[in-house]
Amino acid sequence: MKDVYFMERDPYAPIRHCYGISKILYEGKSKYQEIQVVESHYFGKILILDGVVQFTEKNEFFYHEMLTHPVMFAHKNPQNVLIIGGGDGGILREVLKHKSVKKAVLVDIDKDVVEVSKKFFPTVACSMDDPRAIILNEDGFKYIQDYKNEFDVIIVDSTDPVGFAHVLTTEEFFKYVFEALKEDGIYVGQSESLHYHLDIVVRFQKALKKSFPIVDLYTTVIPVYAGYWWSFSVGSKVYNPREISREVDVETRFYSDEIHKNAFLPPNFYQKILNGNFKY
C-alpha cells in the first residue's frame, strides 16, 4: 500500500501526533478497546489502543525500563512482583531481568492485548513463557483486593486514566495497593505528562499521599507520548525511591544508576508543583 498517515486521538493532549505508516498489520476490537498494529518506516511496528500510541518498536525501551527499574533497584530484595496492566509484556520483561525475582504476576483485563503482543511484538512479549511469570486476564482493581502483605513491588502500567483504567488512579485503589504490599513494599505507576496533564499528576500524587508515608515523582522523555516529559509516581512504605539499594546489574539500553538519580525532580521544584505554584 502507499504511505498513509495515522493521526493519534489522545483525549488529554492539545496536539495530535501524525505517523506515516506503510502497512496496517492488525485491526480489531476487544471487549474493552480498539486495538491496532501498524508498520512505520521510522518507528517499526506500533501498538495503538483506542487511537492512542502505546509504544513503538524503535523506542519502547525508554518507557518500559523507566517504569520498572527505579523502584526495583530502590527495593533491597524484590522477590514477588505484581504488574497491573502491561499486557504487552514489556514491564514483565524488565522485571524478570532481576535475579532476585521469584514470581511476577501480570494482571491485564484484556486478553486480546496479550495475544496481539505475542504475535506482533515478540521482543516485548518475550518473557511471558518464563516459569516465574503468571499471566492472568482479570480486573486488576478487583484482583488486588484479595491480597494483604503479599508483594514486594507493585507496578501499574495502565492506559490513560479514562474508561476502565480510571479506577487505577483513585484513593481507594491506592489503599488496596498499600495493603497488598509487604511492610517494605513500593509502588509505581505512570502518571501522564507534566506539560499537558499537570493537574492529573498533582491529583495522582495527592491521592498516593493518603496511603503512603513516602511519595515521590520522577520523569523521563518519551518521544511518542504527547507532552514528551512523562512522569512516574512512586509510593513507598520504607525505601527512599531516590536511592539505589543494590548494584545495577541488569542489561539495559537506557536506565542506569546515573539516570536513576537524575530522573527525580529537585525537591524544591517538586514541592512547587504539589503546592500549585508551578504554572505556565
Swiss-Prot record:
Keywords, in A-Z order: Cytoplasm, Polyamine biosynthesis, Spermidine biosynthesis, Transferase
Residues reported in the UniProt entry to bind spermidine: H64, D88, D157, S158, T159, D160
Pathways per UniProt: Amine and polyamine biosynthesis; spermidine biosynthesis; spermidine from putrescine: step 1/1
Broad enzyme group: transferase
PABS domain: residues covered: 3-237
The protein's role, per its UniProt record: Catalyzes the irreversible transfer of a propylamine group from the amino donor S-adenosylmethioninamine (decarboxy-AdoMet) to putrescine (1,4-diaminobutane) to yield spermidine.
Protein name as annotated: Polyamine aminopropyltransferase
NCBIfam families: MFS_SpdSyn, PRK00811.1, speE
Classification via PANTHER family: SPERMIDINE SYNTHASE (PTHR11558:SF11), SPERMIDINE/SPERMINE SYNTHASE (PTHR11558)
GO cellular component: cytosol
Alphabetized Pfam families for the sequence: Spermine_synt_N, Spermine_synth
